[in-house]
Amino acid sequence: MDFEKDVIRTVTFKLIPALVILYLVAYIDRAAVGFAHLHMGADVGIGDAAYGLGAGLFFIGYFLFEVPSNLLLDKFGARKWFTRILLTWGLITMAMALIQGPKSFYLLRFLLGVAEAGFFPGVLYLITQWYPVRHRGKIMGMFVLSQPIAMMIAGPLAGLLLGMDGIANLHGWQWLFVAVGLPAVLLALPTFLWLPDNIDKVKWLSIEQKQWLKNELVKDEAEYDQTRHANPLHALKDKRVLLLALYYLPVTLSIYGLNLWLPTIIKQFGGGSDIQIGFLSSIPYIFGIIGLLIIPRSTDRLNDRYGHLSFLYALGACAMFLSGWLNSPVMQLAALAVVAFCLFSSTAVFWTLPGRFLTGASAAAGIALINSVGNLGGYVGPFGIGLLKEYTGNMAAGLYFLSIVMLFGLILTYIVYAKLERQKTQTVNIQKPL
């Protein structure tokens, strides 16, 4: 057991902090557009519906190029492909400062999705290549921690950058895009020099440790009936993969609907400066961090993914409804904090599921498809809320819509359990000799 702990601790120390930093940069980048919208719309003529459409177009580009990107990652290796992703997404984010109107906004948001496609599922794929199944819940929780941390940082940071309005004849939102895009460009070279492609190429594990880790991954393939398709594209037709892609939709639709509109929701509480809005926007994400520190470890300890997911969806749906129904800004913010607790921790738990039945290049293709289809929710959520806000004049209808979406996720939890886990258990029982 001490040997196993040493190996997992070493791998985690060498990989996870740097991957968390990279995803932190990516998620701050994604959050920037929500804060830029507070002023950009008036400067270049982008209304609520146009903003919702443009914010969502990122995910159309992401959807179309996710699977090809992850297959190229498997072909060229994580080191080269992650370097490419960082360079292109950083440069395109900085180019967002040049937006002149809705058309250029739409184009650059779409291109940003194309550029970033493959990063998040690429990291998930790496986790399946480095960690046995029994350790993935905790590790996934550690990695997904970068999401709420990024949102917590993004609020105050955006408030400060928006305050630079007029410096060097640039608007504050232009400074915001330049500032959040630059770190990705600067991290490209260190990533190329540091990130290993596979277990065999690292020098920080002994031969004995490498062999143990590879043996454990092989054991997982047998124990969890993992599939390694002869052609990785066949994973795209696997019914289990398609079901999980559908199951991921409620998570992404809710989380991006909330993330990209939260500054506007906070502003409707009663105004306030950009810095005040930024700091208030960070509060729900503190609870997202708490959820990620508690829930994934609990799922590993109890070996119960679906019970936890059911609880999170049910609680999140109730809290989302209350955030639109309540009139007190304090209570609304408290309800949104509960929503963040549920959404971020459910994301970490969800991503332990595909690796239970996919491995190798099939995992790269399958995870990419799940993420790309699921991330269509990132298009529907912001766009749908934008339309509802423009029609009703407030955010309540959009929050009720997200509450219904989370109830749909609760229903899907039972369907996924019945189709994947219970069916597998019955098969195992039938195969046991009498």
UniProtKB/Swiss-Prot annotation:
One GO process term, biological-process aspect: response to antibiotic
Transmembrane residue ranges: 15-35, 45-65, 85-105, 110-130, 142-162, 175-195, 241-261, 275-295, 306-326, 333-353, 367-387, 396-416
Main location group: membrane
Compartments, record wording: Cell inner membrane
Membrane-topology annotation of the record: Multi-pass membrane protein
Single Gene Ontology MF annotation: transmembrane transporter activity
Record-linked Gene3D superfamilies: MFS general substrate transporter like domains
Description of the deletion phenotype: Inactivation of the gene causes a significant reduction in the surface-associated motility and virulence. Mutant has 2- to 4-fold higher susceptibility to novobiocin and trimethoprim, and 8- to 32-fold higher susceptibility to the quinolone-type antibiotics nalidixic acid, levofloxacin and ciprofloxacin. Mutation does not affect susceptibility to beta-lactams, aminoglycosides, macrolides and polymyxins.
Domain of life: Bacteria
CDD domains: MFS_ExuT_GudP_like (cd17319)
Cellular component per GO, a single term: plasma membrane
Function description: Efflux pump that mediates resistance to quinolone-type antibiotics.
Protein name in UniProt: Quinolone resistance transporter
Naturally occurring in which organism (per UniProt): Acinetobacter baumannii
